[in-house]
Amino acid sequence: LRRQRQMCIRDSDMTTEIEILQYLHYHPLSKRADIGSEVTPEISDRTLKRIIADCVEKGYVEVVGKGPATRYRLTPQAHLTMPLNLDTYFDKDIDERTVQESFNFNLIRGILPAVRLFTDDELAILYGAQSKFRQHLSEMTDLEYRKEMERLGIDLSWKSSQIEGNTYSLLETERLLKEKQTASGKTKEEAVMLLNHKDALDFILDEPDYLKEISLGRIEEIHALLTKELGVERNIRHRRVGITGTNYQPLDNEFQIREALEDSCLLINGKSEVFEKALLALVLISYIQAFTDGNKRTARIISNGILIAYGHCPISFLSLIHISEPT
């Protein structure tokens, strides 16, 4: 019974810890009393002090000031790595979700440069997979490597396009990309989207160093390859866009969009860890929404292009479950 009670206390403390971190995410520099008033269920001040002290020791929370003026805020690391219950988040209606509705200007210049995106255990898993990839690669001829990349290109083109609402099956995609055979009952735009993916991936394979360092111009070039003949405006957008399914409103000022992308390039190019480079490219290009359409397509291809540039195994995204989402 004592052991069960101790386990219940630990579980309760963990729940309270998550609530504290989530509260501080949206209410930085809060007093302990303010934090306690928002934590459910109600706990004693002694317990609250102990849990906050644990958060400070773990590097999740910073203490600002002393005595009655003491305030608490999240560390940059906790801003990105604190636990988040996705099921609870998506169970709420859009207007009930707690989100930052405007662009976070501190993210790229303040938070991301100061944090590690992967733990040592996560990096060990990634580099274990990378070691197997390199071993597999060393046993291939140039022709076999190209065929392997062709297969991965088909998988990635299909999945990336499916995420955008494309209805081609994987088999139909293979026929289209290998034999230029369009599928009956499908639109021309769907075929063009898939062929554009192939062109972008072929370009990266032919110029493997192209994305070793990324730039605004190179991001725009990959975007142009992915969206050609689809009626999508080239280069940075000049008008406001909205995103279905969220109250987040991307930047609507061309100069701020340009600055955010350029800052992202500096951040990514300055990182030494390749997996961090690829992940940052994936999330930041998607977050900034610099183009009227094709943002996530561009992010997925550039992320893979970075992996390829450094001799790392690209990702097909095949295991992702398809849901309707904005581009």
Model-derived regions: residue spans:
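FIC/Doc superfamily catalytic core
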Residues: 6, 10-326
